[in-house]
Every structure is written in structure tokens, then in C-alpha cells.
């Protein structure tokens, strides 16, 4: 876990350390908007538009692993999955965005902004489902960049959180790669499908965003990929 010394100033009356002023203005709530990127587009989740594509991208004998650490197991049939997407699309918190692959025009995953706290300017990215066509592509990284940019630059949040099952090694590697700082483990934090879940907590702060933004944009630049579409430099190499 990264060591952290909180910024402080002395209280003028007691001399004891207190937090620095952060302002009392609230952040804005995320909206159902379209966020356009080079490789992917985020748009409000819609059961009519997105169910068929998402079902194909996330269901099949070779795709059970996609659901391993999510709250829901793989769905038994298309109708159940559509009802699931309808419920998610109607939610305001979490607020779901479909991830659209711009080359194919198909929905290949979804992600959310959740635990939305405009007063304290804290928000979380979660409920991330990447179908097999999205995994390990530039669009998978860009989908995260687009939400981060929206959160920090448009909505004005101070803290952006990532939480996952502590046993979910791929999610934890992704958090590290995307520039989140590991903050610790919440033991016996919740139960998922009647099993214990210890939760790993990560965050990016608004003061850290400019450096992370530079790294994302440099990595996503088409010049960072060869003619076979392979990266020339890793995202971590730009930090």
C-alpha cells in the first residue's frame, strides 16, 4: 500500500493539524450523454439498442469468466439478460454507459458511474463488463480514459474510486495500469452470491489527473501502434 501523508495546516486556535480548504461548491451529477472517442463511444445504456450485441459479446461456453467477479452470474437465456439490461438502463446510480466499438458499431461492454456524491465531490467507476471483442484492445483503455476525463474536467470531482474483489487479479492489475493508487483492503466488506468478498480500494485524485491524462493520450495516439495494431510503448511507460 502506498504511504500517504495528508496535507494539513495548523488550526489558528488550537495549533492542531486540520485539512486544507477544499471549497464548498458541489460537483455536477453525471448525465445520460454520449462521450465520443477515437476507438469507442460511450452512450446511455438502452435495452432495445444494446441487448443483442451485449449478449453475444458476453455469453457462451468460453465467456463464463467474464462474470466471475460480477454481482450477477451468466444469464440462462436472452430474455433474462434483456430484463437485466432494462433494470440497469433505468438506474440513476449506478448510471450505466454502453461501450460502442466504433469500427463495428456494436455494443461490446458497459461501465458505470456510481456512489455519486456531488457534495464531497467523490464518485466511483464500477459495474464494468468488457465483452470478449473489447478485451485487450485500445478501446478498452479508451473507455476508462473517457469516463475519467468527464468526471474530472466536466463534472468537477475531487476523487475517483475503483473498487474490486481482492481476489480479482485482472481488475487489480487494470487499476494499477490505469494509474489508480491502492489504498488497502476492506475485510469482509460484503457478500456476493453467498460468498465473502474482501474489497480492494483504489483512487485517483483531481491533482493527479493531469499526469494520468497525458499518459492516456500519448498511449492512445495512433502513432503508438504498429501496422499490426500492437502497442509500441506501454501505458506505464508514459507516466
Question: Model regions: which residues?
Answer:
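Conserved active-site tyrosine of GNAT-family acetyltransferases
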Residues: 174-175, 202
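Conserved beta-strand-loop-alpha-helix junction that forms the acyl-donor binding cleft
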Residues: 162-171
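Conserved GNAT acetyl-CoA-binding A-motif
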Residues: 153-163
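Glycine-rich acyl-CoA binding loop
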Residues: 140
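Conserved catalytic-core motifs of GNAT/GCN5-like acyltransferases
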Residues: 181-195
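GNAT-family acyltransferases
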Residues: 2-137, 150, 195-200, 204-210, ...
Amino acid at each position: 500500500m502506498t504511504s500517504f501523508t495528508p496535507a494539513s495546516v495548523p488550526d489558528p486556535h488550537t495549533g492542531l493539524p486540520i485539512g486544507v480548504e477544499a471549497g464548498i461548491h458541489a460537483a455536477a451529477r453525471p448525465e445520460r450523454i454520449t462521450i465520443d472517442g477515437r476507438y469507442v463511444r460511450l452512450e446511455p445504456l438502452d435495452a432495445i439498442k444494446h441487448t443483442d450485441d451485449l449478449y453475444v459479446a458476453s455469453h457462451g461456453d468460453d465467456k463464463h469468466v467474464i462474470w466471475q467477479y460480477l454481482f450477477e452470474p451468466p444469464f440462462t437465456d436472452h430474455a433474462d439478460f434483456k430484463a437485466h439490461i432494462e433494470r440497469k438502463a433505468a438506474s440513476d446510480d449506478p448510471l450505466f454507459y454502453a461501450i460502442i466499438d466504433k469500427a463495428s458499431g456494436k455494443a461490446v461492454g458497459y461501465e458505470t458511474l456510481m456512489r455519486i456524491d456531488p457534495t464531497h465531490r467523490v464518485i466511483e467507476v464500477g459495474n464494468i463488463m468488457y465483452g470478449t471483442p473489447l478485451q485487450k484492445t485500445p478501446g478498452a483503455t479508451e473507455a476508462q480514459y473517457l469516463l475519467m476525463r468527464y468526471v474530472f474536467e466536466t463534472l468537477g470531482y475531487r476523487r475517483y474510486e475503483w473498487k474490486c474483489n481482492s481476489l480479482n487479479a485482472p481488475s487489480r492489475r487494470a487499476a494499477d495500469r490505469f494509474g489508480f493508487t491502492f489504498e488497502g483492503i476492506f475485510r469482509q466488506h460484503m457478500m456476493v452470491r453467498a460468498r465473502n468478498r474482501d474489497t480492494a480500494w483504489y483512487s485517483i485524485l483531481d491533482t493527479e489527473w493531469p499526469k494520468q491524462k497525458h499518459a492516456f493520450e500519448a498511449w492512445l495516439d495512433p502513432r503508438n501502434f504498429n501496422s499490426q495494431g500492437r502497442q509500441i510503448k506501454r501505458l506505464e511507460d508514459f507516466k
